[in-house]
Curated annotation (Swiss-Prot):
The active site is at S133, Y147. Belongs to the short-chain dehydrogenases/reductases (SDR) family. This is Short-chain dehydrogenase cctT. It comes from the Eukaryota. NADP(+) binds at I7, T33, K39, E55, N83, Y147, R151, V180, T182. It comes from Talaromyces islandicus (Penicillium islandicum). Glycans are attached at N131. GO terms for cellular component: endoplasmic reticulum; lipid droplet.
Length: 283
């Protein structure tokens, strides 16, 4: 019987879609989920990859997906990859709390909901859960407070699941992903940032907008290369953390060996904080 894998967030041009193709090439039966099947791209034409609609912020949608997968596989799942997530770049003083909660629903609580729904299948298969987090969760970036804090929380959730699922025979691995060039961070696919007229940061809107769009960067890792590295690391049983993508290892080194204030200063040099009176930490 074929090994099985379910991957969330498999829209065309993203990490999930790239991983789906690699697992398929390695002989897995692949369940690739997307919010909207219209965005599935070339995955839709590959035999052996089943496209499923899934809204990871909906418990009911997750339940229906789990029931369908259980029927297809006889109640087992070898690998669950929680890859779906959303970005958010906005000053915290201007952030909509409703929108911020949606980011946490997608990047944090969806991991818990997926774990709850698919745990019986993973336990039965003595399988693996792979949770995709981000290097942003290890850094304090201006304008990324909502996103980076959600990634920090997601990493802690993943690590707690590792402890709690280990006695049940399920391996949990956290991927700390650095810069990867995907369709999702192509500037042409990202709307311009709009700050309220009352924002304290109006005069640096253009700078924050550049951070929002992340821009195409020559040093970002190709999505297909990153996907293959992550899949191979996971299948080779390489540790409880996987670091791939631009600056993922560098982040760990800087966090470990640089003074906190220096590290924070270095990564915020291009944030235009000095244009609004920023002079570093006050303590």
């Amino acid at each position: 019987m074929l090994k099985t894998v379910l991957i969330t967030g498999c829209s065309h041009g993203g990490l999930g879609a790239a991983m789906a193709k690699i697992y398929h090439a390695k002989g897995f039966q692949v369940f690739a989920t997307v919010r909207n099947k219209a965005k599935v791209g070339s995955l839709g034409g590959i035999d052996g990859i089943e496209i499923m609609e899934l809204e990871v912020t909906s418990v009911e949608s997750i339940r229906q997906c789990a029931n369908t997968v259980a029927k297809r596989t006889g109640g087992t799942l070898d690998i669950l990859v929680n890859n779906a997530g959303v970005n958010a770049i906005v000053p915290l003083l201007d952030a909509s709390l409703d929108d911020a909660k949606k980011v946490y629903d997608a990047n944090v609580w969806s991991v818990v909901a997926m774990a709850q729904a698919f745990a019986p299948m993973l336990i039965k298969a003595k399988g693996t859960m792979c949770n995709i987090s981000s290097v942003s969760g290890e850094m304090v970036f201006a304008w990324a407070g909502v996103y980076s804090s959600s990634r920090s929380a997601g990493t802690r959730i993943s690590e707690t699941l590792r402890l709690e699922l280990a006695p049940l025979g399920v391996r949990v691995v956290t991927v700390i992903l650095g810069g990867v060039q995907t369709s999702g961070n192509d500037p042409s696919n990202i709307a311009d940032l709009e700050l309220p007229s009352s924002s304290y940061y109006q005069k640096i809107t253009a700078v924050i907008d550049l951070h929002k769009k992340t821009m195409v960067h020559p040093n970002k890792q190709n999505v297909d290369v990153a996907a293959e590295n992550v899949v191979n690391d996971l299948l080779n049983g390489r540790g409880i953390f996987i670091r791939r993508g631009q600056a993922s290892t560098l982040s760990w080194l800087f966090n470990t060996f640089l003074p906190y204030r220096l590290f924070t200063y270095l990564i915020n040099r291009e944030s235009a904080l000095d244009k609004i009176g920023f002079r570093g930490d006050t303590e």
